[in-house]
């Protein structure tokens, strides 16, 4: 594989060319950090891929947003294969301390492929250490 990246302004252009069992592939994109301060850390990325194999080729493109702070995180990823349907994935989770022995953790996720029904997941835990 050949990988490269170059800093441009507040972001980075990246790319990879290589070969695997699916055939030849290339991936390129741009990643940028919007802020990293008391609001947390917020990053975004846009990318595209191309795979050439014995059965033909595929082209995908998408984007991703990630946010996190000391208590929580969230992510959103949207992608689409040319000729296909869009895919969406979103997740978030957090941990909040009430005192030194008590905390609440909770999170959830949503994922959908094309026009199908979305997969939804939620979880929560209340913990107290005696």
From Swiss-Prot:
It comes from the Eukaryota. Keywords: Antibiotic, Antimicrobial, Immunity, Innate immunity, Secreted. Pfam families: Gloverin (PF10793). GO terms for biological process: defense response to bacterium; innate immune response. It is found in: Secreted. The keyword Secreted applies. One of its GO terms (cellular component) is extracellular region. Hemolymph. InterPro entries: Gloverin-like_protein (IPR019729). Its main location: secreted. Antibacterial protein active against Gram-negative bacteria. This is Gloverin.
